[in-house]
Amino acid sequence: MSSSLILIIILSYMTGSISGGIIVGKFRNIDIRKKGSNNAGATNALRTMGIVFALIVLFIDVYKGYFAANYIPYLLNENTNQAKILASLGAILGHVYPLYFKFKGGKGVGTALGTLFVFPELSINIVIGFVCWLATLIFTGFVGLSSIIAGISVSVAYLLNNNTLDDLALYSILMSIFFIFTHRENIYRMAKGKENQFKKVMIINLFKKNE
């Protein structure tokens, strides 16, 4: 691996370490990692700070993934898919294990989403992933499960559409596996029947309101 690719990973990791949830929480005198699900992502920001702050957190997390994957390789004259994928991985790792916040961050979903916008080949897969995420959410109410299903659907859709195990296929597969890892506590709580649900968005509850 060249020195420029290593530098891309390092700079992307440092960019990913800028945690929207923790920074926004400081303006509210809240350590988001000690509230709700103890996670620094947008979902916990919604639970603990409300929708406006959650949207700000989501924007920061998504954009830093896009910035790292799109601009850092370009600035270092390594504007290839390989460089962009390495930058993407660096940013996601930075979000989950932020250098500036004692390596305790979010679960990487928003940042990973931001990286996907850099690859035109994944455009339709983003739509498929969102549809699967939304469908899972309104039927189950579990955001963590929705994120896992979305990640898996992106990788499966790419493989089915392209029928090749190229760099982007490997990246999408690795991303979906990593989502399962970062949501392992959610999976455990779901198995125990203790996972929090967003019941307001569940389709069964929407029908009940209209009865």
Which residues make up each language-model segment?
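Helix-coil boundary and interhelical linker segments in multi-pass alpha-helical membrane proteins
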Residues: M1-L7, F67-L86, F117-I126, L159-Y171
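Alpha-helical transmembrane segments in multi-pass membrane proteins
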Residues: I8, S12, S17, G21, ...
